[in-house]
Amino acid sequence: MWHEARKHERKLRGMMVDYKKRAERRREYYEKIKKDPAQFLQVHGRACKVHLDSAVALAAESPVNMMPWQGDTNNMIDRFDVRAHLDHIPDYTPPLLTTISPEQESDERKCNYERYRGLVQNDFAGISEEQCLYQIYIDELYGGLQRPSEDEKKKLAEKKASIGYTYEDSTVAEVEKAAEKPEEEESAAEEESNSDEDEVIPDIDVEVDVDELNQEQVADLNKQATTYGMADGDFVRMLRKDKEEAEAIKHAKALEEEKAMYSGRRSRRQRREFREKRLRGRKISPPSYARRDSPTYDPYKRSPSESSSESRSRSRSPTPGREEKITFITSFGGSDEEAAAAAAAAAASGVTTGKPPAPPQPGGPAPGRNASARRRSSSSSSSSSASRTSSSRSSSRSSSRSRRGGGYYRSGRHARSRSRSWSRSRSRSRRYSRSRSRGRRHSGGGSRDGHRYSRSPARRGGYGPRRRSRSRSHSGDRYRRGGRGLRHHSSSRSRSSWSLSPSRSRSLTRSRSHSPSPSQSRSRSRSRSQSPSPSPAREKLTRPAASPAVGEKLKKTEPAAGKETGAAKPKLTPQEKLKLRMQKALNRQFKADKKAAQEKMIQQEHERQEREDELRAMARKIRMKERERREKEREEWERQYSRQSRSPSPRYSREYSSSRRRSRSRSRSPHYRH
């Protein structure tokens, strides 16, 4: 089998190779015999009798009916022929006034070029009419001279070292002499340039090469063409145009042949190389989208206070009558540098309506109320400090409308705030006492009641809207009321929030308040261990605290909290916040993907079990049907065998005979085959 397959494959390959070679030979043959389409039309005529009947033919050719044309007895025409009226051809006299348009004149000149091109070339080459007619006669008899193709010319050009030698007279052939002649002599004698093979009867189909003509020959050609109705300079211009068109056609044909050569599935690389070669010299302009310039934006200019806090604020309800400047809280009564920075920011904002800002106190820590007087009431994102035992991070978004009178916060100050804050809290202090307090806080000025659930044994001051918070605190028994030790590090968007927090809290809170409330409020909390601690008065509705793992992750990004220094600790940058958020989202997504993968595996296993059960059931059904079919065939065969038997014994019942048939081997039963 293998040898036969190899033999068949060789036969097929030979047929394919033969077919390719035959196709190449056929293409070469057709290329060789291809001619100008103008040469396909040949008109041949001979003298013959129009009438088959001799009497009618004699009557038709009698002098009564026939007459010589233009007095030539050799050329007889019928007297009813229209040429009888052409005995006298008058000379053409052009009209004095030309009524043709310039377009018609241009078309007429082009037509004259097409009509008399051969005659102009013959006149320029000095070929008489008899020579031209004789050349036409030779072409009709033997066909046109086969001109060497471009490939043959290239092959001949490569063999320049070989010398044509004839053994008869032992002289160098005339080809070398013709090659050594200068170009000026070749251009002067047009007959030699037209046809080197036949000098007596030149080939009139060869057109004049315009590029080889000098100025005198060009002028002579144009002068010869003016006698045939062409303007001065038309003939050479149209000759050059024809040559360019022929070159373009030749180039297009070469491209088509090269494309046909590279056609097929396996010649993708050749096609790419051919395309690159064609586009090599061409300058390609860049695409439109690459040329367009991107819009440029000016860098976002931040104020020093804004860049220090790295937060933005948005005021939805500005105070009517004046535009509020955005300032940021930088201190809660800490060191001199922070107080000076706060005073400078307040003086630059120019928002105050009451007293001027309090001068910075050169002393140590100041009470919380005096320190809070240095803050500006604004719609801002506040950045503050935290104590050595506490640092909290909250992100609160508020839109508040406040009124400030004097340098202090008063209980009569109304803040209309709408805040949504998210923070996560965990508190830790020196005394690790865990307590749970449940306090009720009433909001002043018609605000809603709020329940606050806290595990912090604290008495928090301040009236605010409804607040619910859960926090764990290991509260200490010693807190500082204000000054350098108590800092609250937060990033909030609340206009009326001042805080003295002793606890390290990350509470997830969210609150919304539409009622005016005093910024300072008090709340009583029932707790297991009483230890007073001032707390921030913010409008919050807390969510359950985050897990300790999240708190540890957040703690890692902050600097060490064990240093007892009064300087403000840097808060989380937006990139770190985004990184934490992305990490949490990735963890959630990983858990969800893992759960989905497990469910998918369980589902696939369940489907596989169902398919196996279905296949078992189908196999069982097929076996049952096969068994029934065999039983039917066996019964049919027993019935036929019992009819064919000569002496059927009545004592053999069907059961007995069937049991005997079953015991027989399959080789003894020719009719029963499985």
From Swiss-Prot:
What segments bear the compositional bias annotation Pro residues? 356-365
Quick one: where's region Disordered? 171-232, 258-674
Q: Which residues carry this modification: Phosphoserine?
A: 101, 285, 294, 331, 335, 547
Basic residues bias (residue ranges):
265-283, 411-443, 481-492, 659-674
Q: Which domain of life is it from?
A: Eukaryota
Q: Could you state what the record's PTM comment says about this protein?
A: Phosphorylated in vitro by CLK4.
Q: Which residue ranges have biased composition labelled Low complexity?
A: 378-399, 493-506, 514-532, 642-651
Q: Quaternary structure per UniProt?
A: Probably interacts with CLK4.
Q: Record's family?
A: Belongs to the splicing factor SR family.
Stated name of the protein: CLK4-associating serine/arginine rich protein
Organism this protein belongs to? Homo sapiens (Human)
